[in-house]
């Protein structure tokens, strides 16, 4: 990687007692921030953001690649993932609790970080990129905040398939 990148890590409050981990990468020389060149990544339901967007494969992560091209790049961990607040329910047996990060709560986390970035950079909009479950989360966030989104990018959305649905496999056993 030839360009010098700055990495910052911070937390953003979402709700009382819930802090969301955020990582930011940008060129060290980056001083002017614009809506068109600011990006927020959100992970799916399995792994936190940095493991999907900031693992340096071949020496450079996806975040590094975009940041080295002049973008101000952020990723966040939804509550219960990675370095964000671990809900109390995670200390109890799983059968005692519903899923930890439900979609409405995750959208609150994303919206809190979205508003934080807009205020921090003095911009009115930014680009959203979601992966898997993050596609659903980012779509809802974009619908609820259309005036704050330049573009919505969906990477591997869960509802688009090129193979027949297993729910409609026809008569007989699935063979699993």
Walk through the language-model features, giving the residues of each:
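Glycine-rich "HGGG/HGxG" loop immediately N-terminal to the catalytic nucleophile
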Residues: 49-52, 74-100
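Structural signature of beta-strand start/N-cap positions in the alpha/beta core
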Residues: 72, 125-127, 151
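Gly/Ala-rich beta-loop-alpha elbow adjacent to hydrolase catalytic centers
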Residues: 130-134, 138
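Conserved acidic catalytic loop of the alpha/beta-hydrolase fold
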Residues: 104-125
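N-terminal cap/lid segment of alpha/beta-hydrolase-fold proteins
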Residues: 1-34
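Alpha/beta-hydrolase-fold enzymes
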Residues: 140-176
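Short beta-strand immediately N-terminal to the catalytic nucleophile in serine-hydrolase-like folds
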Residues: 106, 128-130, 155
């Amino acid at each position: 990687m030839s360009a010098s990148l700055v990495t910052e890590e911070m937390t953003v409050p979402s709700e009382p007692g819930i802090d969301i981990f955020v990582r930011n990468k940008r060129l060290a020389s980056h001083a002017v921030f614009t809506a068109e060149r600011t990006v927020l990544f959100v992970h799916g339901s399995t792994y936190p953001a940095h493991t999907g967007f900031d693992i340096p494969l071949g020496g450079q992560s996806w975040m590094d690649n975009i940041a080295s091209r002049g973008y101000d790049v952020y990723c966040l961990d939804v509550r219960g993932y990675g370095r964000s607040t671990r809900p109390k329910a995670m200390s109890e047996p799983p059968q005692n609790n519903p899923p930890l990060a439900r979609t409405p709560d995750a959208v609150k986390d994303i919206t809190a970080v979205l508003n934080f970035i807009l205020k921090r950079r003095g911009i009115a909009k930014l680009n959203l990129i979601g992966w898997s479950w993050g596609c659903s989360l980012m779509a809802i966030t974009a619908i609820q905040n259309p005036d704050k989104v330049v573009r919505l990018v969906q990477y591997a959305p869960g509802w688009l398939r090129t193979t027949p649905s297993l729910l409609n496999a026809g008569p007989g056993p699935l063979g699993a």
